[in-house]
UniProtKB/Swiss-Prot annotation:
Gene3D superfamilies: 1.10.8.60, DNA helicase RuvA subunit, C-terminal domain, P-loop containing nucleotide triphosphate hydrolases. The keyword S-adenosyl-L-methionine does not apply. One of its GO terms (biological process) is protein unfolding. Keywords: ATP-binding, Chaperone, Cytoplasm, Nucleotide-binding, Stress response. ATPase subunit of a proteasome-like degradation complex; this subunit has chaperone activity. The binding of ATP and its subsequent hydrolysis by HslU are essential for unfolding of protein substrates subsequently hydrolyzed by HslV. HslU recognizes the N-terminal part of its protein substrates and unfolds these before they are guided to HslV for hydrolysis. This is ATP-dependent protease ATPase subunit HslU. One of its GO terms (molecular function) is proteasome-activating activity. A double ring-shaped homohexamer of HslV is capped on each side by a ring-shaped HslU homohexamer. The assembly of the HslU/HslV complex is dependent on binding of ATP. ATP binds at residues 18, 60-65, 248, 313, 385. It comes from Xanthobacter autotrophicus (strain ATCC BAA-1158 / Py2). It holds the Pfam family AAA. Its main location: cytoplasm.
């Protein structure tokens, strides 16, 4: 769990996302509160529940991007899911408890990665010895092994092909369901896992070059040094105390006014979400998981429905409301120039791989922003995503001919931009064909 202060979290988000100060503050405080809770004594820690967040704002203003960046910062089990993927319990499809099961798998992956780093040195040596066995045989003299070890570490043998024995996974094995426990839940049992445990794991030979063999063997040797049961227990503890779930597109499961009758992927899903967000115990194949202290961040554009169309109980379980503002022309210019991996920097770097030096002038950036604003206002406002469309249109010819123009310098100015997009942006009928 990261111990960044709210100010540090906001400044980290500022590097990638323009504006939306309120949303950044809300998620920063929520993330810091996870750390604060861990500092309390056991009795009080149980009582402190997370304040779940509902982010409301039009499409393309940064809701999903905030979640993506937060996942990297959190250092905790983090899962982003779309609410539209789920159906009510009892119907064909995924039920919402699958969210917790997926979160546990994420947690296990995180903990395993951390444990592998702890045993990296021992595993590295064991993997190196197995590669040497494949190269010179287990019975080779120490002098021969040392000579080959030096060459191996120098990278001289990277392209040499060797045959190694690796653990055979159960990917090709059939799955079967326990009656009454559908496959979307924990009832899908992998026969490969069961047989592997019963017979101590199977291995199969693989022919790969030395460079590819080392990572495969490193992971295998690291796993031998790790207590797998301890990983699962630690992961469940991490998920229960630090887990974060980002529920995107929650507006799509809101009931709409004037609709009648059951809707298994709308109100039914909301009803199923209630106990999950409030706090319940979910059965997983690794054991029961409590959701009382998992932080839920829900987001939606609410174009057609309103937040008040959600079930009142669900609204009550999302106490912190944050509204994100629509982006302006000035925001578009900042997105193109100030963010760490801006679209302009990406385009210049991509053209650089072809040997083309691309220069996009300041007035070109402003012209791209103008075109995006104009098309958004004439057709459909899809926020910052429109910038990708405009840039692709501007650089379309160059992207196609770049391999033939290696060594050239191409300057894109405002006139160049307008000549490519102005007609389409001005004509509302035609601009409907800009996706």
């Amino acid at each position: 769990m990261s111990d960044f202060s709210p100010r540090e979290i906001v400044s980290e988000l500022d590097r990638h996302i323009v504006g939306q100060a309120n949303a950044k503050r809300a998620v920063a405080i929520a993330l810091r509160n996870r750390w604060r809770r861990q500092q309390l004594d056991d009795k009080l820690r149980e009582e402190v529940l997370p304040k779940n967040i509902l982010m409301i704002g039009p499409t393309g203003v940064g809701k999903t991007e905030i979640s993506r960046r937060l996942a990297r910062l959190a250092g905790a089990p983090f899962l982003k899911v779309e609410a539209t993927k789920f159906t009510e319990v009892g119907y064909v499809g995924r039920d919402v408890e699958q969210i917790v099961r997926d979160l546990v798998e994420v947690g296990i992956g995180l903990v395993r990665e951390a444990r592998r780093k702890d045993v990296q040195a021992k595993a590295h040596l064991a993997a190196e010895n197995r590669v040497l066995d494949a190269l010179v045989g287990a019975t080779a003299s120490p002098a021969t092994r040392d000579a080959f070890r030096k060459r191996l570490r120098a990278g001289e043998l990277d392209d040499k092909e060797v045959e190694i024995e690796v653990q055979a996974g159960g990917q090709g094995m059939p799955m079967f369901e326990i009656p009454g426990m559908p496959g979307t839940q924990m009832g899908a049992v992998n026969l490969g896992d069961m047989l592997g445990k019963a017979f101590g794991g199977r291995s199969k030979p693989r022919r790969v070059n030395v460079k590819e063999a080392h990572p495969l063997l490193l992971a295998e040797e690291a796993d031998k040094l790790i207590d797998q049961d301890a990983i699962v227990q630690d992961a469940i503890h991490q998920v229960e105390n630090n887990g974060i779930v980002f529920l995107d597109e929650i507006d799509k499961i809101a009931g709409r006014e004037g609709r009648s009758g059951a809707d298994v992927s709308r109100e039914g899903v909301q009803r199923d979400l209630l106990p999950l967000i409030e706090g319940t115990t979910v059965s997983t194949k690794h054991g029961p998981v409590k959701t009382d202290h998992i932080l839920f961040i829900a987001s939606g554009a609410f174009h057609v429905s309103k937040p008040s169309d959600l079930l009142p109980e669900l609204q009550g379980r999302l106490p912190i409301r944050v509204e994100l503002e629509a982006l302006t022309r000035a925001d578009f210019v900042r997105i193109l120039t100030e963010t760490e991996a801006s679209l302009v920097k990406q385009s210049v770097a991509l053209m650089g791989t072809e040997g083309v030096t691309l220069t996009i002038t300041t007035d070109a950036v402003e012209a791209i922003a103008d075109a995006a604003v104009e098309v958004n206002s004439n057709v459909e406002n899809i926020g910052a995503r429109r910038l990708q469309t405009v840039i692709e249109r501007v650089l379309d010819d160059l992207s196609f001919s770049a391999p033939d123009r290696s060594g050239e310098t191409v300057v894109v100015d405002a006139e160049y931009v307008r000549s490519r997009v102005a007609d389409l942006a001005r004509n509302a009928d035609l601009s409907r064909f800009i996706l």
